[in-house]
């Protein structure tokens, strides 16, 4: 007690405080509970007010009642008798965010607010007008529809202690200009992933907001581009920039000592990483997947790195020795899809913590490093596929008890599959892929010891013997894939016990005996593929119980009997191939009652290839669908030893159908059987059917009109049957039909004259009693056959012959007359327009045209000043183009633009073309489209991309162009790693001149002139000689004619290329094209894009060059050009002056493209330019052209000697 008195005497103020506390405790005990109750009551009222403001939904927040305390409300947690946490994730609130800021943010003791996926909308700005509890430090608003600029984040300044903010998966835009003030709070966690943030250098904004204390920062899944400045976030431990459009070198860090997680995957980062990460000592996760990094793998922090993903780059050399330093810590290592070579070092075996190693799709070679790999005691996933390893597969892998996935596919492994691969009963092997190797011998019975096995693929080997019945004990097996081996014997009945089985693929073996009816017990089966064997017996009707069955392939066997009507109960069936068997009886109508369902697992995690047959006599059936995972496409030649077909086309991948109509079948091949009777009319309900082959049977009767309902059919083969009657007119509605074969039947009457029948060859109708085009047999006008009618027929034929003869004679006179007129007209035109003659280049540079292609009869929209149109524009069917692009698959996509997507395709004649699939248009512009196509198709010049053909069906419009090897100038110049070539100055100069020449041709040689309207670097394509070809000329005019939904601004250019006068009036002119060309020329000189916020901020390339014109102008040139050859600086300046003349704000002061060519010739005369970009005298002879800018020998522009005046 004395001690306490001493303390009190020393601190009298403390004594007073203690006395006050004692008063509160002993004399006012009810006060504190009352305060808590009052506070809780206030919280309850605010929460109930929030509920009352929500849309009236009975099930929403049902237990938020005034009769219960808020601590028992759904999603509410309390601490110290106050609401401290609210989590309404996945609650369909359907309100504006302002309600949240009005009722929830002000809760005074709230620490955490989670409204993830709560259907919130509106902007963040309402937060600035509300109050915020001082304890609130975490807000999660992910997966809503909140919009507005991300600069609205500053509205949370009222929440002074806010540390974590999650705004991922919303619709936020780049920061607005009006709210770039610094925030009054310091975030540690900021998640902006999956928003609409694009085209903005975000890091300076983050710094300006004062978020320098960030520890977690995610921008994943946006559209950010440009360069990245040096990052200065000393506390940053997690940085995710994946799935953006960054195209720059590896980012540098001022201080990365705390960085633990770095994800740059799925961008376009390029170059050598160097030593950028050497000081990141705590880095444990590094993902550089799917970029364009090159060179050697750099030295990485070895003390802490656990997860390293380098997949999909261009790293080269042998296995990186520096990775040996990581062995103590690395858990997952992915080096796949690179260019590593050599042998795998023994040091990999020292990585005792390694759980995943993927070195697939490289060029590793040598003997399979068995001893090294067998040391990886913790390994779970081992993927070594698509390399060049040799040797055998050892038993020692059975010691890897944690191994779940072993993928050795597509190597050169030999020997037998070891019997002891799963000898330890504790094994955990789930996936075994050994396909596309050179294994021989039997499938070991001991594989049944792999009790956890889910997927087994041994296809594309040389395995012999029978399928072990012991495999029936693998109760978890989903995939049994053994195709293209030499397996014999019967399909084991024991497979009926594989209750999880989804895919049974045994094609191209020597299997015999019947199809086990007991397979119907495997109710999850999606795919049964038994084709190209020696199976016999009947198709089990019990297969109709497989409601998930999507693909049934039994072709090229010796199966007999009827087609079971029960197969119609397979309501998910999309592919039925029974060709080349001994099936008899009729086609059962119940076969066509599919519901339109499809098994999801069919299209999950699988790779498919469809091989279209060539149609030769030895080749039966329409084609073959194969599971192609883990197999090199070039290995398809091995199929030819078992299959007598030459493949006309190979399709990879498959698009999941979306069924809105009745039926789901897309492929039906019953050809080469002994079927009889008529075609069931129910077949016409198969709306999605793409391939129908009933050829080489004994079917009879008339072709039903209902087949006109097959709106998606592309191949129709009814040949070699006994069909009679006429060809139904309903078949003319099959607009996607690309191939038809009605030959060798008893059909009669006229072949329909309309499309698509006017595009098929005559042999497709041969050996019938048909008449009309394309057969050489004309049709008579009526059925009468009496003598009088016969005589009239002779007279009509004689008259017709006379008319034809007179017509031919008259045509010859007309042709001679037209030639004389053309010659005289041409002479006068040469005298009047001598300056323009050189641009004629009057020869077509399209070598892929075919003389058999048909003329169209559309009226021309323009009078084109050309000597001749040597070959008619090609008209192609939609089916042709659908086939050539594999159904417009993403693998064929090479570019996208304002008018549509562009696909690379190979047509049936072998020509490689580019197909532009235009945006959908209304039918109102059909006539205009045809007219414009005929016009554009006649424009031929060596610096223009020629239009080869077109197709129109429904709302689809497709244009076929000559394919340009190197793509667009934009890609080559600004995305060099994608194309793989570097443009030096001579190449750029050649491109500049070629593009100018092509544009000049459009402006001065087409009457009336063609205004491009969208001249830009992405519309300058480069052929195999890097010759510039201007593309998309006439597109804006075409789209305008077709009444599309594009805005006027879209039709008048692309931002960065649009001349200033277009913003006052959308009246386009050739001088507008000249301005746009000037921007392209600046791109060639500077190497920069016309709009890049990282380089120019709110400015653009033209404005940026203007600023430099007041200082050291040479700073604008691409440094790489001057590094290569400093002597070209004068020439660059001369070309810059040309660009400046084109970019004059006063459109009447700009030169014409003819004058631009004259300037280039003037520069050429004084610089000794190489022959690749030589300008001929005719290119610049413009007598009669209105006056304009003159250019002196030294390149000075006499309209204004100071460069800045032209800017």
Curated annotation (Swiss-Prot):
Residue numbers binding ATP: 894-902, 916
Topology relative to the membrane: Single-pass type I membrane protein
Root EC class: transferase
Residues at the catalytic site: 1014 (proton acceptor)
Subcellular location: Cell membrane
Pfam family, one: LRR_8
Protein name according to UniProt: Brassinosteroid LRR receptor kinase
Glycosylation, residue list: 119, 166, 196, 235, 245, 287, 339, 363, 412, 449, 521, 556, 584, 646, 662, 724, 746, 767
Residue windows of the LRR repeats: 109-131, 135-157, 161-181, 186-207, 213-234, 235-257, 258-280, 282-304, 305-325, 329-350, 353-374, 378-400, 402-423, 428-450, 452-474, 476-499, 500-523, 524-547, 548-570, 572-594, 664-686, 688-711, 712-735, 736-758
Protein kinase domain segment(s): 888-1163
Source species of the chain: Solanum lycopersicum
Domain notes: A 68 amino acid island between the 20th and the 21st LRR is essential for the binding of brassinosteroids.
GO MF annotations in UniProt: ATP binding; protein serine kinase activity; protein serine/threonine kinase activity; signaling receptor activity; steroid binding
Motif Cys pair 1: positions: 71-78
SMART domains tied to this protein: LRR_TYP, S_TKc
Highest taxon listed in the record's lineage: Eukaryota
One Gene Ontology term from the biological process aspect of the record: defense response to fungus
UniProt signal peptide: 1-34
Reactions accelerated catalytically: L-seryl-[protein] + ATP = O-phospho-L-seryl-[protein] + ADP + H(+); L-threonyl-[protein] + ATP = O-phospho-L-threonyl-[protein] + ADP + H(+)
Protein family according to the UniProt entry: Belongs to the protein kinase superfamily. Ser/Thr protein kinase family.
């Amino acid at each position: 007690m004395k001690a306490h008195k001493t303390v009190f005497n020393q601190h009298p103020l403390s004594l007073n405080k203690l006395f006050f506390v004692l008063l509160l405790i002993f004399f006012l005990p009810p006060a504190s509970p009352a305060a808590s109750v009052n506070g809780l009551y206030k919280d309850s009222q605010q929460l109930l007010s929030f509920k009352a403001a929500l849309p009236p939904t009975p099930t929403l927040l049902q237990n938020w009642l005034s009769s219960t305390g808020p601590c028992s409300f759904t999603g509410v947690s309390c601490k110290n008798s106050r609401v401290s946490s609210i989590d309404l994730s996945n609650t369909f609130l359907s309100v504006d965010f302002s309600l949240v800021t009005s009722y929830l943010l002000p809760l005074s003791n709230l620490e955490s607010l989670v409204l993830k996926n709560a259907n919130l909308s509106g902007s963040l700005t309402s937060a600035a007008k509300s109050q915020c509890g001082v304890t609130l430090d975490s807000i999660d608003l992910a997966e809503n529809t909140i919009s507005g600029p991300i600069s609205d984040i500053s509205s949370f300044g009222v929440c002074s202690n806010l540390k974590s903010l999650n705004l991922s998966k919303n619709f936020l835009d780049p920061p607005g200009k009006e709210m770039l003030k610094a925030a009054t709070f310091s975030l540690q966690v900021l998640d902006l992933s999956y928003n609409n943030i694009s085209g903005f250098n975000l890091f300076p904004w983050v710094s300006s907001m004062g978020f320098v204390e960030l520890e977690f920062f995610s921008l994943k899944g946006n559209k950010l581009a440009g360069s990245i400045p040096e990052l200065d976030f000393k506390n940053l431990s997690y940085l995710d920039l994946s799935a953006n459009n960054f195209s720059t070198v590896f980012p540098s860090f001022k201080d990365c000592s705390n960085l633990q997680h770095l994800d740059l995957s799925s961008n376009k980062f390029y170059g050598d990483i160097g030593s950028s990460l050497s000081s990141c000592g705590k880095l444990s996760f590094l993902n550089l997947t799917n970029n364009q990094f090159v060179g050697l793998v750099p030295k990485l922090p070895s003390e802490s790195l656990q997860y390293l993903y380098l997949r999909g780059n261009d790293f080269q050399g042998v296995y990186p020795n520096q990775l040996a330093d990581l062995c103590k810590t690395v858990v997952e290592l992915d080096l796949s899809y690179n260019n590593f070579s050599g042998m795998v070092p023994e040091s990999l075996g020292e990585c005792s913590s390694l759980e995943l190693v993927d070195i697939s799709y490289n060029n590793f070679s040598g003997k399979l490093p068995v001893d090294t790999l067998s040391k990886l005691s913790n390994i779970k996933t081992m993927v070594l596929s698509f390399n060049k390893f040799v040797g055998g597969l050892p038993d020692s892998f059975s010691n890897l008890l944690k191994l779940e996935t072993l993928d050795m596919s597509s190597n050169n492994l030999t020997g037998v599959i070891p019997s002891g691969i799963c000898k330890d009963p504790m094994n955990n092997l789930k996936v075994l892929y050994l396909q596309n190797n050179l294994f021989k011998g039997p499938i070991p019975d001991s594989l049944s010891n792999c009790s956890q096995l889910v997927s087994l693929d041994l296809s594309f080997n040389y395995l012999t013997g029978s399928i072990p019945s012991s495999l029936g004990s693998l109760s978890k097996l989903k995939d049994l894939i053994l195709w293209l081996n030499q397996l014999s014997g019967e399909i084991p009945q024991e497979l009926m016990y594989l209750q999880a089985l989804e895919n049974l693929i045994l094609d191209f073996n020597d299997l015999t005996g019947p199809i086990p009816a007991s397979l119907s017990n495997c109710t999850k089966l999606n795919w049964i593929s038994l084709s190209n064997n020696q199976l016999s017996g009947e198709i089990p009707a019990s297969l109709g119980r497989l409601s998930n069955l999507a693909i049934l392939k039994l072709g090229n066997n010796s199966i007999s009997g009827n087609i079971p009507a029960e197969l119609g109960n397979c309501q998910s069936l999309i592919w039925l191939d029974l060709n080349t068997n001994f099936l008899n009886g009729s086609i059962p109508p119940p076969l066509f009652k599919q519901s339109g369902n499809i098994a999801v697992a069919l299209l999950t995690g699988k790779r498919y290839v469809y091989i279209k047959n060539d149609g030769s006599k030895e080749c039966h059936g329409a084609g073959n669908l194969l599971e192609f995972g883990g197999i090199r496409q070039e290995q398809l030649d091995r199929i030819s030893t078992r299959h007598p077909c030459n493949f006309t086309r190979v399709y990879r991948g498959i698009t999941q159908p979306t069924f809105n109509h009745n039926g789901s079948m897309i492929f039906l091949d019953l050809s080469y059987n002994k079927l009889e009777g008529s075609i069931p009319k129910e077949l016409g309900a198969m709306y999605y059917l793409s391939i129908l082959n009933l050829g080489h049977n004994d079917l009879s009767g008339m072709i039903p009109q209902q087949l006109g309902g097959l709106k998606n059919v592309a191949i129709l083969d009814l040949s070699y049957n006994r069909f009679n009657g006429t060809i139904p007119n309903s078949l003319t509605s099959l607009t996607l039909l690309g191939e038809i074969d009605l030959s060798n039947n008893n059909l009669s009457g006229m072949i329909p004259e309309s499309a698509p029948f006017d595009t098929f060859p005559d042999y497709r109708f041969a050996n019938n009693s048909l008449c009309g085009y394309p057969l050489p047999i004309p049709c008579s006008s009526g059925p009468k056959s009496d003598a009088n009618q016969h005589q009239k027929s002779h007279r009509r034929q004689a008259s017709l012959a006379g008319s034809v003869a007179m017509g031919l004679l008259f045509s010859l006179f007309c042709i001679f007359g037209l030639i004389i007129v053309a010659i005289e007209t041409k002479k006068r035109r040469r005298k009047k327009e001598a300056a323009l003659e050189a641009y004629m280049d009057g020869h077509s540079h399209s070598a892929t045209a075919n003389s058999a292609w048909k003329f169209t009869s559309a009226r021309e929209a323009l009078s084109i000043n050309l000597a001749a149109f040597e070959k008619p524009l090609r008209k192609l069917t939609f089916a042709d183009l659908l086939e050539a692009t594999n159904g417009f698959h993403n693998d064929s996509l090479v570019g996208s633009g304002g008018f549509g997507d562009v696909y690379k395709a190979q047509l049936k004649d072998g020509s490689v073309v580019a197909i532009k699939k235009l945006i959908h248009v209304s039918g109102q512009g059909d006539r205009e489209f045809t007219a414009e196509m005929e016009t554009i198709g006649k424009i031929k010049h060596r610096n223009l991309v020629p239009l080869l053909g077109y197709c129109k069906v429904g709302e689809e419009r497709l244009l076929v162009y000559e394919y340009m090897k190197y793509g667009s100038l934009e890609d080559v110049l600004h995305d060099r790693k994608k194309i793989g070539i570097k443009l030096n100055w001579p190449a750029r100069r050649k491109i500049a001149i070629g593009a100018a020449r092509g544009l000049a041709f459009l402006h001065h040689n087409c009457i009336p002139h063609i205004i491009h309207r969208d001249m830009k670097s992405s519309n300058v394509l480069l052929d195999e000689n890097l010759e510039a070809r201007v593309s998309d000329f006439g597109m804006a005019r075409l789209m305008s004619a077709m009444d599309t939904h594009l805005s006027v601004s879209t039709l008048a250019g692309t931002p960065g290329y649009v001349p200033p006068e277009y913003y006052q009036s959308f009246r386009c002119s050739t001088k507008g094209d000249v301005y746009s060309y000037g921007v392209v020329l600046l791109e060639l000189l500077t190497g920069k894009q016309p709009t890049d916020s990282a380089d120019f901020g709110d400015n653009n390339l033209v404005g940026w060059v203007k600023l430099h014109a007041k200082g050291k102008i040479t700073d604008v040139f691409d440094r790489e050009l001057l590094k290569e050859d400093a002597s070209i600086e004068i020439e660059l300046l001369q070309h810059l002056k040309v660009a400046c003349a084109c970019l004059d704000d006063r459109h009447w002061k700009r030169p014409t493209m003819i004058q631009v060519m004259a300037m280039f010739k003037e520069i050429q005369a004084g610089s000794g330019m190489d022959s690749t970009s030589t300008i001929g005298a005719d290119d610049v002879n413009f007598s009669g052209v209105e006056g304009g800018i003159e250019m002196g020998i030294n390149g000075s522009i006499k309209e204004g000697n100071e460069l800045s005046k032209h800017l």
